[in-house]
């Protein structure tokens, strides 16, 4: 009977390793796609309906975003790794004359969600390098949206596509900001 127990243990370990391998392969494909992204310009893109889980807490520093994403992923039944996951990010709202981070989210399956990112038009801006200019980019995007006869329809969404979990070189970080818009 010992050998049967050992076999079950090994089968479980193999499944875990296969899951980890699949996750890594998917992440490599995601990272490869970033080389085809357009940087430093606002553009309008169409996105499908996206289902999300979220954790709403005061976020006063970048390090707390990782902590909250990890906390959120642990509360989910799905086996996911959010650190370095292009399907996770933070919500940024305009409150009291400033942009503030109000929650973190993870895209998830349809039947397990807290809110929905509606399908439709999104103004996007993707850039590389440090995060210290992100706040001014919200204003830049807002101006671009108005100049191109669109109206903002929700909060800004910040996706950290490549960050400290993939590279130690700050110049290799990639951030994508999205905000839902509609024509005026």
At which residue positions do the language-model features occur?
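A solvent-exposed interaction/effector surface
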Residues: 1-184
